Amino acid sequence: MIFDKGNVEDFDKELWDAIHAEEERQEHHIELIASENMVSKAVMAAQGSVLTNKYAEGYPGNRYYGGTECVDIVETLAIERAKKLFGAAFANVQAHSGSQANAAAYMALIEAGDTVLGMDLAAGGHLTHGSPVNFSGKTYHFVGYSVDADTEMLNYEAILEQAKAVQPKLIVAGASAYSRSIDFEKFRAIADHVGAYLMVDMAHIAGLVAAGVHPSPVPYAHIVTSTTHKTLRGPRGGLILTNDEALAKKINSAVFPGLQGGPLEHVIAAKAVAFKEALDPAFKDYAQAIIDNTAAMAAVFAQDDRFRLISGGTDNHVFLVDVTKVIANGKLAQNLLDEVNITLNKNAIPFETLSPFKTSGIRIGCAAITSRGMGVKESQTIARLIIKALVNHNQETILEEVRQEVRQLTDAFPLYKK
């Protein structure tokens, strides 16, 4: 019987080898991709539970199928914990991803072809904020706002003037590569001034918001969307919040049956675990440590005139660095750092002049190393290792030194092999 084949290593050695190799990679590489984090064993256990067997179209208490009394408890736990964590009146935990959450929010708020003002991808926005290759840009008329050319920060007066000019039905705030705190109250004032809805995509900063170390968009936005991984340190998935009952009904209808069929109740269970972890007072210490580590790492780059720190600093979990004084582009930097077991990604910088496949910058985030227990000292060391590798990118002896120093760090802060 299929139930006898419970050991992946014995049943599917080829797959197991790939999984094991990834486990070793995570254990021995320094993870600096800003959208990645390391979940607890409890989150993984919930996601790998028997809940994966259950189909449950609909919502708790109103399902299409029978036998849903147990998953109703699971999903209700996730909903109530999300509401408590973020101080929201309503929560939808069924969205499979942040992109699905954004799609549902758009469906609830606007019609195809409506004008939307969102952060330009090159300035730090996300694909789902109007990129022409994405469903958002294909379905709606997105107009992008950027950052100030001098400060590389959001200029709210300029955004207001742009909103007056284009008269959007919706304004989207939030980013995937913006290192500064966002003033959601100002964004709501801009939206109110032009009669637009305000939607905030807090995917990257959700954990910081939950911990109270970053301003919350929930009191100001008509709808807030998020992923449940990144700084929130949960499973890969989506979340939608609102304080408006009428919008909550539209959101639920947009998610199911509008965009999705059956929810992934095993993932929702993992979300519930992550929300409970984030409700623990210790999570605030973790989130503050992310900010402290990121600031410490960014400061090392700021003090080296061979690199340019975008916007001059960071207020959250991420920062961007222009690397073109020491290496041709961000792609080469990313590939080189992969070779010394430091993982990050190339990233466009504001007013980028290179191809998005090359870029002038790299993006660095500290959520994952903070989950391993690394602190300010280690963050500074990692920054120096990155600089050492990039500056000496043609010197294999020095690159090998960096590899050994990376291994010493990861051995000192084990991930799942404690």
Swiss-Prot record:
One of its GO terms (cellular component) is cytosol. (6S)-5,6,7,8-tetrahydrofolate binds at L121, G125, H126, L127, S355, P356, F357. It comes from the Bacteria. One of its GO terms (biological process) is tetrahydrofolate interconversion. Its EC number is 2.1.2.1. GO terms for molecular function: glycine hydroxymethyltransferase activity; pyridoxal phosphate binding. It is an enzyme of class 2 (transferase). Pathway: One-carbon metabolism; tetrahydrofolate interconversion; Amino-acid biosynthesis; glycine biosynthesis; glycine from L-serine: step 1/1. Keywords: Amino-acid biosynthesis, Cytoplasm, One-carbon metabolism, Pyridoxal phosphate, Transferase. Gene3D superfamilies: Aspartate Aminotransferase, domain 1, Type I PLP-dependent aspartate aminotransferase-like (Major domain). It is found in: Cytoplasm. The modification N6-(pyridoxal phosphate)lysine is found at K230. The record marks H229 as: Plays an important role in substrate specificity. InterPro entries: PyrdxlP-dep_Trfase (IPR015424), PyrdxlP-dep_Trfase_major (IPR015421), PyrdxlP-dep_Trfase_small (IPR015422), Ser_HO-MeTrfase (IPR001085), Ser_HO-MeTrfase-like (IPR049943), Ser_HO-MeTrfase_PLP_BS (IPR019798), SHMT-like_dom (IPR039429). The keyword Cell membrane does not apply. Its cofactor is pyridoxal 5'-phosphate. Belongs to the SHMT family. Catalyzes the reversible interconversion of serine and glycine with tetrahydrofolate (THF) serving as the one-carbon carrier. This reaction serves as the major source of one-carbon groups required for the biosynthesis of purines, thymidylate, methionine, and other important biomolecules. Also exhibits THF-independent aldolase activity toward beta-hydroxyamino acids, producing glycine and aldehydes, via a retro-aldol mechanism. Homodimer. This is Serine hydroxymethyltransferase. It comes from Streptococcus pyogenes serotype M18 (strain MGAS8232). The gene is glyA.
